């Protein structure tokens, strides 16, 4: 059976996995960031990440006001088959924690790119933000790297309800 791929306009879909075009990705850790109009960035787990983890049962998130370094955990997720950190993709300060995912981590399995974001971070400076974003996959590069990752792990994305 051939691989399933579609261009949905604002996102690509490959093997059932959504890859929104406007996001920056850490492919290895399967975490994304979106740059917001107010200068903050929103961070969450990718569709591939939530599929690999399985139904998420627990989340521990660093509190608002915590200063984070790129690569250091902003949260820890746990499912029945996996537990691991969610790294910050930019240096800055946590300015908001999503109460929906704290109350029900499984929400990430349902809507990983929408209302199920994990934290919002105010970057330390424009310079550090530019530096940090330049080290992430974006656009066509993200699309190709994500497809390679999906193929290597033989993933077909599903959203757990």
From Swiss-Prot:
Keywords of this entry: Lipoyl
**Stored Gene3D superfamilies:** 2.40.50.100
Q: Which Pfam families match?
A: GCV_H
- Comment on bound cofactor: Binds 1 lipoyl cofactor covalently.
Sites bearing N6-lipoyllysine, chain numbering: 81
Gene Ontology CC annotation, any one? glycine cleavage complex
Cofactor(s) essential for the protein: (R)-lipoate
Task: Show the CDD domains listed in the entry.
Answer: GCS_H (cd06848)
Family the entry assigns: Belongs to the GcvH family.
Role noted for this protein: The glycine cleavage system catalyzes the degradation of glycine. The H protein shuttles the methylamine group of glycine from the P protein to the T protein.
Task: Report what the protein is called.
Answer: Glycine cleavage system H protein 3
């Amino acid at each position: 059976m051939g691989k399933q791929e579609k261009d949905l306009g604002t996102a690509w879909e490959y093997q059932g996995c959504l890859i929104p075009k406007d996001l920056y990705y850490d492919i290895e850790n399967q975490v994304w960031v979106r740059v917001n109009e107010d200068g903050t960035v929103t961070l969450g787990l990718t569709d591939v990440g939530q599929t690999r983890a399985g139904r998420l049962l627990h989340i521990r998130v660093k509190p608002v006001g915590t200063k984070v370094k790129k690569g250091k955990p902003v949260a820890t997720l746990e499912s029945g088959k996996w537990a691991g950190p969610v790294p910050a993709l930019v240096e800055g300060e946590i300015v908001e924690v999503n109460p929906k995912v704290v109350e029900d981590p499984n929400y990430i399995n349902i809507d990983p790119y929408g209302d199920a974001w994990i934290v919002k971070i105010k970057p330390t400076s424009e310079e550090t933000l530019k530096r940090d974003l330049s080290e992430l996959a974006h656009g066509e590069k993200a699309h190709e790297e994500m497809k390679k990752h999906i193929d290597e792990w033989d993933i077909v994305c599903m959203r757990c309800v």
